[in-house]
Design a protein with these regions (language model features):
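Positively charged, structured surface patches that bind polyanionic biopolymers
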Residues: 1-79, 90-130
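Minor-groove-contacting beta-hairpin "wing" of winged helix-turn-helix DNA-binding domains
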Residues: 82-87
Length: 132
């Protein structure tokens, strides 16, 4: 099972302190730390699974997903494929290791949302260009 580090500065972020509801905060932590979140920064899980794991009801989850996507711009949600893309995941969870990049590329075959795959591929390209 992967180890996920959370930057403790998250708890000092004024947006989280002032604007996130308790459900937004909890769901955000769940998305960041779930074993269902791939190395590429995409969580793949139906709402029923998220509800089971978090003990939030589906309406609470949908409300928080909407907040995290539209209000706070932390994620993108693809309802059809049950996938959540964490925006800027790479800033906190990737290194410039070529082995890591190769592992991330392998995880993309599990992602159905083409928009999410393209986002991650663009991010990988930027990382490769930084290493040159």
């Amino acid at each position: 099972m992967p180890n996920r580090n959370i930057n403790t500065d998250m708890w000092l972020d004024s947006e989280i302190i002032d604007d996130f509801s308790k459900n937004d905060t909890f769901l955000w932590l769940y998305i960041l730390t779930s074993p269902k979140t791939f190395l590429c920064g995409v969580l793949k899980a139906p709402l029923s699974s998220i509800a089971f794991d978090t003990k939030l009801n589906k309406n609470e989850i949908i409300e928080s997903i909407n907040n995290l996507e539209s209000k706070f711009h932390k994620i993108k949600y693809n309802k059809e494929n049950d996938e959540i893309l964490i925006l800027n995941w790479h800033k906190y969870n990737w290194t410039k290791s070529s082995k890591l990049i190769e592992s991330i590329e392998r995880t993309l075959k599990n992602i159905k949302s083409q928009e999410f795959v393209e986002y991650v591929e663009r991010t990988i390209d930027r990382y490769r260009n930084l290493n040159r």
